[in-house]
Structures are given as C-alpha cells and as structure tokens.
Amino acid sequence: MSQWKYLVLFFIFIFGFILKTLSDAGEFKTLDPHFSGDCLPIPGVVGAEDITFLKNGTALISSDDRRGSYLGKDIHGTIYSYKPGENGEGLIDLFPNIKNDFHPHGISVYEDQNGGTFLAVVNHPSSGLFNSSGGHSIEIFHYDSDSLTHLRSVKDPLLVSPNDIVLINKDQFFVTNDHGSSSKLGQTLEKYLQLKNSNVLFYDGLNFDVAAIGLGFANGINISSDGSILYVAETIGKQLSIFEVDKTTNNLELMRSIDFNSGIDNIEIDHEGNLWIGSHPKVYTFSRHMKDSTVLSPSQVYRFSMDNSSYNIEEVYLNLGEELSGSTVAAVYGRTILIGSVFEAHFLDCKY
C-alpha cells in the first residue's frame, strides 16, 4: 500500500475517533428544556459544587471560585449554610475570616443519635490546611448553630484525585477518586480514551483501603439510610453503579450498573429514599464551559428510584444553561430543590 493511502487511513481513524468521542459525550443530543416548577437564583455563592441538607432543613454548601484559582488569584473557598425560602437572606458564610488554603469539593454530613452533626469535606489545598502538609485531604468538622469547629485532617497517598465523600459515622467514610492517575497527562488520557481507572476508597478511622475499582470517572457517592447500599455516579461511564455494603467488613459487591446516557455528577437522597442527581448532558460542552464562562453548559437533574429489581429514572429539570450552567448537584428537602454548579456565581432555589 502506498504511503498516501496509509495517511488517508490515519486521518479517517482520527476523524472517526473524534466523532465517537463527541457522540459519547452527548454533543449530538437534541435537548428539550423543561421544569414543572419555579427557580429563584441566589447570588453571592461562587461554585456551589456540592449541597446537602441537614435533617432540620438547613443546607450546607461547598463553595469555591475555581476560575479565580486557575487564574492565580489568592483566594479560598468556604462552606455556607442556607435556609431555603428566605430569598438569600438565610445565607451564612461559616468561614468569613479563614486565611488557610481551603478549596472544598464534595461534602457529606452525618448526624448521630446524640444530636451531634459532623461534616466531611474533600479539600484540594496547594499548601495544606489547618497545619496539614500539602496535597489532597479530607477535613472533618463539628457543626453547631451555624458554626464549624475543625476536628482533624485525613491524608493518604491513596487520595490521588478525591472528588466526593459519604460519611457512614463520624469517623469512617467512603470517598471517590475520579482519576486513577495523578499526572495531567494521565488524567487527560483517562478522559479522552474513556479509561475506567478510577476507584472508591474506604477509610476505617485509621487506614484507607481500595473498596471498588474499574470505574469511569467515579464522581458523586452516597449511601442508603440503613447503610446497606452504596451509590456511585460514573461521569464518563454515564452510569450509576450500585453496590451492596457488607456492614461487618464494609466490603463492596457490585449489584448492578444502570445507564443514564449522561455525565451524572453528585448524588443526594431525599427522605423517601429517592436519589437526586445533577448531571451534564453534554460533557464536552461542559469542558469548554470550564475554560470559558461565555460557553453555556446545559444543566440536568434526575430523580431515581429503585424497588427490588425495577427502577425508574425521571428527568425533573433540563435547562440549556441560561438559568444555570454546568449543574453538579440537586439537593432536596420537602418541595425545595437546590441546584448548584462548579463555576456559576449563584445557585438555584427551586420549588416543584
């Protein structure tokens, strides 16, 4: 075969690879925006990437100006508390004077039988937090009356690229690594080649162990109220993986994986046991939005329920990005949905 034919075949391969990648990322989807409710934008909170409700209806919000950090600005993130229905007046910065390098990501709350409330935060410091050394960390706090008291920092080499966390008590938790590689090149290859190299870790209060492997960008994580079922959102895998938890050993056994055909992100659970999942229907568009705020990224919210062998997936909210770009989380309390995103300078307080 002549040299030019090899060249033609090479370009055909590259073109086909690009088309497949864009198709897998949802770029050719036709989207029909809808929501049977009303949303109010709540300004003043930048990058409300994760939101979770306490049992009393107060929401805790993980906030960080990630674009500002990318541009080298000397800024830090924070945790807000928010009481829905007060038009933003119920918003309180729990770290107004923090000077440490605090860049929160996923969060989880555990409320014990004695009334104690504990918050775990995935943190991405560049120079450490609360006297911890550099690198990723899990920060544990006690929450009381709109104040946070830092209890400890947890670090380990297995925390390669932590994303989200779920406490099973005040000392133990599961955490996702959204990549298996810590290098930029390795992480880029994982994304575009859709490699399933990410994992879930379990921390027993002293040590980390790998609990699940072979996941396609393990992102949001949550657990059933009785602690028997663990849910993991795979953004690149576009599926929800459901694990049975051995309550004695906390080992995980994969029960099933359910296709969403969307880049699902954080998982919240309402009082009825329904999963609420923020999602990116067009993942490549979201990656462009990360670099350029003028590129709107569609926002999507699913409600997922499962009963024995049957399940139901309902798309509750879909917007092309005008109302909120790049939704990552939908936290629910009663008839209120709080929808957050990675970069926007507001979140949505919705009634449905």
Residues of each region from the PLM?
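Short, conserved, GDST-rich strand-edge loop motifs in beta-rich repeat architectures
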Residues: 61-75, 121-133, 175-195, 277-298, ...
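Blade-loop segments of beta-propeller domains
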Residues: 42, 48, 66-113, 118-125, ...
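Blade/loop signatures of beta-propeller domains
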Residues: 13-37, 76-84, 189, 193-198, ...
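Conserved beta-propeller blade signature
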Residues: 58-60, 118-120, 172-174, 229-232, ...
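Beta-strand-rich domains and repeat architectures in extracellular enzymes and scaffolds
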Residues: 40-77, 325-329, 342-344
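Beta-rich, blade/repeat-based domains predominating
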Residues: 45-55, 98-111, 156-173, 179-181, ...
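A short helix->beta-strand "capping" segment at the edge of beta-propeller domains
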Residues: 24-46, 89-93, 311-320
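Loop/turn-rich, solvent-exposed surfaces of beta-rich toroidal or solenoidal domains
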Residues: 224, 260-317
